[in-house]
Amino acid sequence: MSNEGKCPVMHGGATSATQADNHWWPKALNLDILHQHDSKTNPMAPGFNYREALKGLDVEALKQDLKALMTDSQAWWPADWGHYGGLMIRMAWHSAGTYRIADGRGGGGHGAQRFAPLNSWPDNGNLDKARRLLWPIKQKYGNKVSWADLMILAGNMAYESMGLKTFGFAFGREDIWHPEKDTYWGAEKEWLAPSGGANSRYSGVRDLQNPLAAVMMGLIYVNPEGVDGNPDPLKTAQDMRVTFARMAMNDEETVALTAGGHTVGKAHGNGNAANLGPEPEAAPLEEQGFGWMNHQSRGIGRNTVTSGIEGAWTTHPTRWDNGYFHLLFSYDWALTKSPAGAWQWEPVNIREEDKPVDVEDPNIRSNPMMTDADMALKMDPDYRRIAERFFHDPDYFADTFARAWFKLTHRDMGPKSRYFGPDVPAEDLIWQDPVPKGNSQYDPEAVKARIAGTGLGAAELVATAWDSARTYRNSDKRGGANGARIRLLPQKDWVANEPARLARVLELLTPIASDMGVSIADTLVLGGNLGVELAAKAAGFNIKVPFIPGRGDASQAQTDIDSFEVLEPLADGFRNWQKQDFVVTPEEMLLDRAQLMGLSAPEMTVLIGGMRAMAVNHGGTTHGVLTDNPGSLSNDFFVNLTDMSYRWKPVANNLYEICDRASGQKKWTATRVDLVFGSNSVLRAYAEYYAQDDNKETFVKDFVTAWCKVMNADRFDA
């Protein structure tokens, strides 16, 4: 009989691994992505403002502490050649490098590398040691610097300590306090699963699933040993081109980042990978958050195993120079295997003086190595052309890399108005989506009065303002109404924006903006606010929608068309529209859009109800307009959705009829997006709340609050 006592408190399954509801009902809508990062998980005091805390940070002292850290080798994890620069750069790189442009998720903007799954990805091996080395500095400066900022700054200071003039640095990344639930990393069930297997991210002829950028589960970029671990630099080059493009990088930036990242530091594979313990999330308690511990052999210094590849890329791995290209182009390279059994390339007949010295003993020299990705820069014709230019023009290489590194580490921070600190570059860069400062000294009511005289209906005004604002992504802080880019390419031609209607509205509102010295961006939002006020009045409520002036108008020259193409809505459940049928259900696409817009489940619910009541569907369809008084900001959508005198029946793909139970007569039509608010138990609870007789005014007020949140989501300048 076991001496182990039975659980005296809640059953173990409630506090550890358990069968979640979506295990029993895998097709059920998972609202968890809207219920994360709230005050209950955040230990900071209510009202804590990171930007205000940053004002008390001694930036120069912090930078000097980081520089000192680089050469303060610790016995528990010795620095290669007495310098932690390579390790810190890899930590920063892998923090920022998870960003993908398709949905703006990933990246280093929230310090997510501290949590699962990223903290335990194979590609992040031993970065737990880098963060632990930073802990005394984080402890010292406390709330004045976030982990997210500190990890990226550590990479910057590592480069500066080794001789690179960096392009700049901006503070402003706020930490999260638990793993992100909204980021899709792939469907594979095993680390580093090769393509073509079950749940593969590839289909067809190596067609990588959107929105993914990395080639394997658990990798940041490409496989350094080759496609699926099979060396072939030309095939690897194609993977690199896709992966880096999905991170918003062109060929020149790809070559610069690869070469600049490998100019310093080394890879580690001098040992037996089988001796490594489990990753941090699976490690025993006594490891205290450390993973990949080697208790079978020495496992540190020259005997460290991380990727399995072994060696430095350059002769002098602790200084910034052009040595990477010197070795790449001066020697022929032969395929071999590391002591840990990983594929790598080593030079043929290399001169002794070109070999890097051992990390512990300067009297020992070893061959440098190149990964399959490095060899791709030599063998792919387009990459080689760029690499040769860098080889012959070191200053151009250094500047190009510094700019690409800045882009890599700041791409997910959004507009420049979010940047903070003394090292923010003065230069505006097109990938920052610059917006000129707008006028805020005017009477919004006078502008609304002019708009009211145009004859535009409330639905047209609301739809146009919504379309302008809905592109905002809280993931990378891109998009939104500021800039009025809805009037520019590519947005003005998007099917989602109903180009003909949009052109008509802009034709009437643009002269008003010009006459009154107001931005078109502000004018569009004011028009939407006016439409909401008119709809509320029709429902019997006199309200004034709050407004914050000062938006600017971006120019076409300030707008990277290709970069903005990824913001095109393929579906918008709030306007009951999708461009085509997708494998993903319409309600899942609604949930994804709501999460990207930074909405909670109640906010998503009240917005759907209000948009349906005001009849602002795309193309003027009446699906889901469950009211006899369209255009009125009433709670009729919820009242009729929850009314048991009606029954619902499917009549076509994504189309349902609402019929009177007694007569069988059709009353309305609706889509899956509409019906999910009566079907999903959580959303139905919200729908019933807003359908209550005593919540008619609450519904209007909550709609206005959520509407303003959408209109102002990108106002980091306000």
From Swiss-Prot:
Positions of crosslink type Tryptophyl-tyrosyl-methioninium (Trp-Tyr) (with M-247): W93-Y221
The catalysed reaction is:
H2O2 + AH2 = A + 2 H2O; 2 H2O2 = O2 + 2 H2O
**Tryptophyl-tyrosyl-methioninium (Tyr-Met) (with W-93) crosslink location in chain:** Y221-M247
Mind telling me what this protein is named?
Catalase-peroxidase 1
Q: Where is the active site?
A: H94
Query: Which superkingdom does the taxonomy of this entry point to?
Result: Bacteria
Which GO molecular function annotations are given, in alphabetical order?
catalase activity; heme binding; metal ion binding
The family note in this entry says:
Belongs to the peroxidase family. Peroxidase/catalase subfamily.
Cofactor dependency: heme b
- What Gene Ontology terms for biological process does this UniProt record contain? cellular response to hydrogen peroxide; hydrogen peroxide catabolic process
Sites marked Transition state stabilizer: R90
Question: According to the UniProt entry, what is the EC number of this protein?
Answer: 1.11.1.21
Q: Quaternary structure?
A: Homodimer or homotetramer.
User: Post-translation: what modifications?
Assistant: Formation of the three residue Trp-Tyr-Met cross-link is important for the catalase, but not the peroxidase activity of the enzyme.
Q: Per the record's keyword annotation, is Oxidoreductase included, yes or no?
A: yes
According to its UniProt entry, the function of this protein is described as:
Bifunctional enzyme with both catalase and broad-spectrum peroxidase activity.
What are the entry keywords? Heme, Hydrogen peroxide, Iron, Metal-binding, Oxidoreductase, Peroxidase
Positions with a binding annotation for heme b: H262
Q: How is the cofactor bound?
A: Binds 1 heme b (iron(II)-protoporphyrin IX) group per dimer.
Q: What class of enzyme is it?
A: oxidoreductase
Pfam families xrefs? peroxidase (PF00141)
Coiled-coil intervals, chain numbering: none
What's any one GO cellular component for it?
cytosol
Instruction: Name the gene.
Output: katG1
Record-linked NCBIfam families: cat_per_HPI (TIGR00198), PRK15061.1 (NF011635)
